[in-house]
Amino acid sequence: MVIANSNIIFVAGLGGIGLDTSREIVKSGPKNLVVLDRIDNPAAIAELKALNPKVTITFYPYDVTVPLAETKKLLKTIFDKLKTVDLLINGAGILDDTQIERTIAVNFTGTVNTTTAIMDFWDKRNGGPGGVIANICSVTGFNSIYQVPVYSASKAAALSFTTSLAKLAHITGVTVYSINPGITKTVLVHKFNSWLNVEPRVAELLLEHPTQTTLQCAQNFVKAIEANQNGAIWKLDLGRLDAIEWTKHWDSGI
């Protein structure tokens, strides 16, 4: 996918990985970058606008846990303004296993609902033009961090959802791939809380391992966007971008 002159919606585009990715996207010259985030950050929006004045940056407050109808209403506002949208990035996520329901609601249900909502505008069965979705999942979708089983399970669910959608592209016209960062130095990682406090030092222990910066992750994220491979399972770890080959242990036969 060519980012230049495209219209992009970025859910959670002002977070740690999100903000650096927004910066890299803006450098590539899209026509519009629409940032949806729960927390307003005027300074970050101003920075993005200054980074490339030719790009129109728009912000809308958005919590992915709102009812599906509210998400559809917001997307209608965006589509009415832009007419077309080329790429949706689902990037909302929390890393706190003490908040079980919210972890599932943000990391999994929010991705499902935002994706479902945009199908009203993209699904070729309804006369839509199709589109591209990049879902930010996690390497914990491959192998869990067992001290944070809720977070790991939510990301595994998001990854499974994404791989299923990719196989529906011939029906919907919407292509999908997953972005799976490894341990990345963000504020969220420092606030990582384990399930039932089974490991009080989980954040500290994770950061003892080799990590990557948010900039390294963002630069590889943009490479994945440009590659635009339906069904790709991208691992973004230690400053590398690698396509993962998923091992099939069972087949539904349908």
UniProtKB/Swiss-Prot annotation:
Transmembrane segments: none
Keyword Oxidoreductase on entry: yes
Catalysed transformations (reactions): a primary alcohol + NAD(+) = an aldehyde + NADH + H(+); a secondary alcohol + NAD(+) = a ketone + NADH + H(+)
Active site (UniProt): Y151 (proton acceptor)
Keywords tagged on the record: NAD, Oxidoreductase
EC code(s) of this entry: 1.1.1.1
Residues annotated as binding NAD(+): 10-33
Domain of life: Eukaryota
Signal peptide: none
Record: residues binding substrate: S138
GO BP annotations, alphabetical order: alcohol metabolic process
Gene3D superfamilies recorded: NAD(P)-binding Rossmann-like Domain
Major enzyme class: oxidoreductase
One of the record's GO cellular component terms: cytoplasm
UniProt GO molecular function: alcohol dehydrogenase (NAD+) activity
Complex formation: Homodimer.
UniProt similarity note: Belongs to the short-chain dehydrogenases/reductases (SDR) family.
Protein name, per record: Alcohol dehydrogenase
Protein species of origin: Drosophila silvestris
